Every structure is written in C-alpha cells, then in structure tokens.
Amino acid sequence: MTMQGNKLVNLGFGNFVVASRVVSIVDPDSSPMRRLREDARDQGRLIDVTQGRKTRSIIITDSNHVILSAIQTETMGQRFTQEDED
C-alpha cells in the first residue's frame, strides 16, 4: 500500500506504519527490550497496536517512537522485505 510515494506496512488490525520511518523490528522478550518499552511508556513515546493481544514484535521508528505489535517479528520482517521489492 502506498500513500503519495510513502510505502505503508500493515502492523495488524488495520494499523499501518510508513516503511521508510522504521529503524528496527525486534523481539520483545529480552530484558533490554522490556526496559525500552517501559521507558517509552514513561516518556509518552509508546504506541500499542496489539488490541490486547500478546506483544510479539517491537518496531522502533526514526522519531524514537516504540510500536508494539501482535505480529511475529519474522512476519513483520517479511512484510517490510515485500514492500522493498514492490
């Protein structure tokens, strides 16, 4: 999906992110990622798009926002790879 030249990637449940703004997609189970999530929550930079489901990936943007997604890290990586090929 594109929006005036910006490619959008589906994060699940009808939520999208501009692909060029994403810096990293990481697994949420490590201690550093838990700290990152808590710091982002405390600083108002956390966006939760899990709709109450378990967090399976964390997306970090160039604006330092942290997005929680219920989609597996590997699946998110594949979606970004597919967007790069289009």
Curated annotation (Swiss-Prot):
InterPro entries: RemA-like. Transmembrane segments: none annotated. Pfam families: RemA-like. Belongs to the RemA family. PANTHER family: REGULATORY PROTEIN SSL2874-RELATED, REGULATORY PROTEIN TM_1690-RELATED. This is Putative regulatory protein DVU_0899. The lineage of its organism: Bacteria, Pseudomonadati, Thermodesulfobacteriota, Desulfovibrionia, Desulfovibrionales.
